[in-house]
Structure formats: C-alpha cells, structure tokens
Amino acid sequence: MTRKKMNPFVAHHLLAKIEKVNMKEEKETIVTWSRASSILPTMVGHTIAIHNGKEHIPIYITNPMVGRKLGEFVPTRHFTSYENARKDTKSRR
C-alpha cells in the first residue's frame, strides 16, 4: 500500500497535547520526542520543542510546514570544521 492512501502518522500523545492546548487557547511550548510525526493543520501557530538527541529545540509551526515531518526541521548532526586545527601552527612546532 502506498503512503498517499494512508493517513499521516502522528503520535497519539502529541495529538492529545495539541488538542489540550487548542482547548485552553493559550500559547505554550509543547515538548515531544516524536520526530516521525507529520505536521497537521491543527498544529499551525504552536511552538513545539523537538528532541534532536541531546536537547529540545523549539520550532514555531507555520503553514508551509504542513504535511512534512517534525524531524526535518531539527538537525541531529553538526559538522565541526577542521579549520581551527589548521590555524593552530604553534602546536606543530
């Protein structure tokens, strides 16, 4: 079965948190570890803190993000440049 025919995946606990915040009509940060969840139109306007493996990164959800996954907006790997090692010529002497 192709993915287009299936409903988008959203973790139940995340969906419950979104509905609870929508009922309160308050703005608060929602913390989640579910990077595989799809962004639904009900999430637009909320700030969701998504786990990147080390910490939670807050992301404000906008309309162009609908239909994509939460994990796409939080990188898990950071490239460390080797320029600092090259500039340190005193340690080579």
From Swiss-Prot:
Belongs to the universal ribosomal protein uS19 family. This is Small ribosomal subunit protein uS19c. One of its GO terms (molecular function) is rRNA binding. Keywords: Chloroplast, Plastid, Ribonucleoprotein, Ribosomal protein, RNA-binding, rRNA-binding. The lineage of its organism: Eukaryota, Viridiplantae, Streptophyta, Embryophyta, Tracheophyta. Pfam families: Ribosomal_S19 (PF00203). It is found in: Plastid, Chloroplast. Protein S19 forms a complex with S13 that binds strongly to the 16S ribosomal RNA. InterPro entries: Ribosomal_uS19 (IPR002222), Ribosomal_uS19_bac-type (IPR005732), Ribosomal_uS19_CS (IPR020934), Ribosomal_uS19_SF (IPR023575). PROSITE patterns: RIBOSOMAL_S19 (PS00323). GO terms for biological process: ribosomal small subunit assembly; translation. Transmembrane segments: none annotated. GO terms for cellular component: chloroplast; mitochondrial small ribosomal subunit. It comes from Lolium perenne.
